[in-house]
C-alpha cells in the first residue's frame, strides 16, 4: 500500500515527507481554503515538494467547466492529478481527461456502482470515503473489498484510494481488503507509528541502560 497525506499545509507535507513513506498528496477546496492562500500557487508549491501524485480538485459542477479547470491544473506540473466529483458531469470530464492523458481521481465514492462507472470512464483513481460511510452506519471497509473484487474480476486498472481515514484500523483493514493507497491526515500517520508495547519496550531499554551505567 502507498501512503498519501491528506492536507494542503506545507509544514505537514514536509513533516510527512521526512518520514520516508510519502507517495503523494491529496487536497480539496476546503483544505486549501483553511490555509488562506491562492489555490493554484499552493498546488504548484506542493507539486515541487512531492514527486508523486498531487490531487487538486475542480470546483465547477458542469463538465465543460471541470475540463477547463482541469487543464489549467494539469499544466502546473506533470504530477498533478485532477480530482473530480462522482457525478454525471464528472464522468464526462473524466472521459475527456483520459483522452488527453490527464490523470484523474474521482472523489466522493460511496457505492460500488459509482466506483465501477468511474473506472469505466477512465479514472486513474477512485476514492471511497470510509469515515463518512461509518458515520451513517454503513461499512466503508466492506465497500473497499467489494470494489477491489470487482476491479480484479473485470481487469480494471483504476487504483483505489482509501479516503476519509479516521484511525489506524482504517489503514490496516483497507490494506488487507485491497486498497492500493490510503490518503491520511498527518495526525493519523503519527498514530500509525505508535503502540503501547513499543513505548513500554523503549522505557525498559532505557531503564536497564541507565541502571547499568549508574552501577559502573
UniProtKB/Swiss-Prot annotation:
CDD domains, sorted: Transaldolase_FSA (cd00956)
Active-site residues per Swiss-Prot or TrEMBL entry: 83
GO annotation terms (biological process): carbohydrate metabolic process; pentose-phosphate shunt
PANTHER family cross-referenced by the UniProt entry: TRANSALDOLASE
Xref: NCBIfam families: fsa_talC_mipB
Function per UniProt: Transaldolase is important for the balance of metabolites in the pentose-phosphate pathway.
Protein's name in the database: Probable transaldolase
Amino acid at each position: 500500500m502507498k501512503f498519501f497525506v491528506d492536507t494542503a499545509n506545507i509544514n505537514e507535507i514536509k513533516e510527512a515527507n521526512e518520514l520516508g513513506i510519502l507517495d503523494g498528496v491529496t487536497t480539496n477546496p476546503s483544505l486549501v481554503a483553511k490555509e488562506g492562500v491562492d489555490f493554484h500557487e499552493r498546488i504548484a508549491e506542493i507539486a515541487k515538494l512531492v514527486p508523486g501524485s498531487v490531487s487538486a480538485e475542480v470546483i465547477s459542477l458542469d463538465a465543460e467547466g471541470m475540463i477547463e479547470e482541469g487543464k489549467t491544473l494539469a499544466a502546473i506540473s506533470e504530477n498533478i492529478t485532477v480530482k473530480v466529483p462522482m457525478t454525471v458531469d464528472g464522468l464526462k470530464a473524466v472521459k475527456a481527461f483520459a483522452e488527453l492523458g490527464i490523470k484523474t481521481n474521482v472523489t466522493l465514492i460511496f457505492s460500488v456502482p459509482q466506483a465501477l462507472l468511474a473506472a469505466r470512464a477512465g479514472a486513474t483513481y477512485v476514492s471511497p470515503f470510509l469515515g463518512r460511510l461509518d458515520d451513517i452506519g454503513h461499512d466503508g471497509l466492506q465497500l473497499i473489498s467489494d470494489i477491489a473484487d470487482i476491479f480484479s474480476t473485470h481487469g480494471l486498472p483504476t487504483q483505489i484510494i482509501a479516503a476519509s481515514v479516521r484511525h489506524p484500523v482504517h489503514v490496516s483493514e483497507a490494506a488487507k481488503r485491497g486498497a492500493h493507497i490510503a490518503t491520511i491526515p498527518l495526525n493519523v500517520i503519527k498514530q500509525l507509528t505508535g503502540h503501547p508495547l513499543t513505548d513500554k519496550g523503549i522505557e525498559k531499554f532505557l531503564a536497564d541502560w541507565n541502571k547499568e551505567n549508574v552501577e559502573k
